[in-house]
Amino acid sequence: MLPFIRSDLAQFNAYKPHPSSDTASAVPPQLDRLDTNESPYDLPPELKQKLAWTFQQVIESNRYPDGGHETLKSAIAEYVNESANISSLRFTAANISVGNGSDELIRSLLIATCLSGEGSILVANPTFSMYGILAQTLGIPVVSVSRNPDNFAIDLTAAQSAIEQTLNPPIRVVFVVHPNSPTANPLTANELRWLKSLSERILVVVDEAYFEFSQNTLVSELAQRPNWIILRTFSKAFRLAAMRVGYCVAHPEAIAILEKVRLPYNLPSFSIASALVALQNRAILLESIPQTLDERTKLINAFSQHPALAVAESAANFIFLRLKADSDNSSDTTLLNLHQQLKNSGTLVRQISGGLRITIGTPEENIRTLNHIQTALIKPELVG
């Protein structure tokens, strides 16, 4: 290891955005990418044409992008009010910060709260891994608690004990995903009560990356809870994963701090233009959601009928599939083999935390996924 590199990074494992495709083996001719929870649908051609015109006629490539994002922030605030059914104007541009993906916002939150030994973070695993990864890159301690293996509810007794016993440094941020990834379950009433009971000295970050699929938001809590921040993204339902646009909704004082620590010109002009076009045409982009939810139901029903598979209900655009503990195929080796068989067949899914996280794709992709899994489970090499 190079002598000028921090020693704690020697054993650090970097995040692999597409771990299923991280291979030198031949790529199947038919590849269904269901491993990163993206939308299976590209932007409509007319919106791409509009963006192409914007790039040619409006964007000056030799100029830095809009560093203040005021137009985009105002458009986001309007959408947040609309999506939460808030009749009076509650959120404005002062409540919004925009990042190069939600990852940048998470990193900015960590810098603003925990750096220099000021604090540690609490997560309930399995959950979105970037909270822990970004904290580790900054030298911030990560405290982990578990979830119920049956319904994936957070172990609140362990979480409360962690809050009380972690003193050097104390827990300053609690991260939750609503609904959670990879398990797809929303926050429970007990979890919400616990989050509301936390001291105002603790920042509660509620990641609503999959809000458009769950239609369950906690933004109305922000008026009474200045220590809460809501994260959202354009990468899922808005079909802009390639543009890397995330945003958060919070108290204006929290937003002002985030603006201090974020990088200047953090969003390219084309990303800003894409997000604005997406918001202006949200009715068109979001009309695919009912079909995604219908396809999700079909997959859950189909997998539930298989004697070796366990699949929970989902409030997101993905499902979490596990092998039943009492089946002949319940070993970790069997799961690894199943994952490899799917990859060989041209279906990329994410193997994580004792299961497979499968993004809901197009109807054709979902049929292939179902067939590939059913075929793989009857192969002799998958028997544990």
From Swiss-Prot:
GO molecular function per UniProt: histidinol-phosphate transaminase activity; pyridoxal phosphate binding
Homology family: Belongs to the class-II pyridoxal-phosphate-dependent aminotransferase family. Histidinol-phosphate aminotransferase subfamily.
E.C. no: 2.6.1.9
Modified residues (N6-(pyridoxal phosphate)lysine): 236
Protein name: Histidinol-phosphate aminotransferase 2
Keyword field: Amino-acid biosynthesis, Aminotransferase, Histidine biosynthesis, Pyridoxal phosphate, Transferase
Pathway: Amino-acid biosynthesis; L-histidine biosynthesis; L-histidine from 5-phospho-alpha-D-ribose 1-diphosphate: step 7/9
Gene: hisC2
Example GO BP: L-histidine biosynthetic process
Gene3D superfamilies (alphabetical): Aspartate Aminotransferase, domain 1, Type I PLP-dependent aspartate aminotransferase-like (Major domain)
Oligomeric form and interacting partners: Homodimer.
Reaction equations catalysed: L-histidinol phosphate + 2-oxoglutarate = 3-(imidazol-4-yl)-2-oxopropyl phosphate + L-glutamate
Cofactor annotation: pyridoxal 5'-phosphate
Annotated HAMAP family: HisC_aminotrans_2 (MF_01023)
InterPro entries noted in UniProt: Aminotransferase_I/II_large, HisP_aminotrans, PyrdxlP-dep_Trfase, PyrdxlP-dep_Trfase_major, PyrdxlP-dep_Trfase_small
